[in-house]
Design a protein with these regions (language model features):
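Immunoglobulin-like IPT/TIG beta-sandwich domains and homologous Ig-like subdomains
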Residues: 1-37
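N-terminal structural segment of carbohydrate-active enzymes
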Residues: 36, 40-166
Length: 166
């Protein structure tokens, strides 16, 4: 069976970590996990045999990995360009030192373009919150490791991009 060893809660209530122990003889199927008033179906897959190097493909020379700085790629949702309460309110496409307004929706809107280029994987600059007074366009001034920056769309847009890309 399955044994719950530890529950870890985070500042962002959208996340919860469960440390579980799955016995070697546990069969594949659906485990019901109760979280508060909600029950979540957790799929238990058939265990793979051997070490990871026997079945992990990773990136190969046949892959085309495309690095995207979301702020610079495409502005798919102008409503998130400036977020009240955030310190960096700059928005000026005429200088490299300010935010340009690109976001996750802009990337999602151009998945066909990336596909047509032959892209097999998208590598994003950091997308977590960068609430610093300036130079936050690159994503490396993160101030919260558990929240997606709302100026590029937040958690909802991040999930939508991932779902659309797969």
């Amino acid at each position: 069976g399955i044994t719950l060893k530890k529950v870890s809660k985070f500042a962002n209530s959208h996340y919860l970590a469960l440390d579980i122990l799955i016995a070697a003889n546990t069969k594949p199927g659906i485990a019901k996990v109760k979280v508060g008033n909600e029950t979540i179906d957790f799929p238990l897959q058939k265990r793979r045999v051997g070490n990871g190097s026997q079945f992990a493909n990773g990136a190969t020379s046949s892959d085309l990995i495309y690095l995207i700085m979301p702020d610079r790629f495409s502005n798919g949702d102008p409503s998130n360009d400036r977020i009240a309460g955030m310190r960096d309110q700059t928005l000026n496409r005429d200088t490299v030192f300010n935010r340009h307004g690109g976001d996750l929706k802009g990337i999602q809107n151009h998945l066909d373009y990336l596909y047509d280029l032959g892209v097999t994987a998208i590598w994003l600059n950091p997308v977590i919150i960068n609430d610093m007074p300036e130079r936050t366009e690159h994503g490396y001034a993160f101030t919260d490791h558990y929240k997606i920056d709302p100026r590029i769309g937040g958690e909802k847009a991040y999930k939508e991009l991932i779902d659309a890309a797969h």
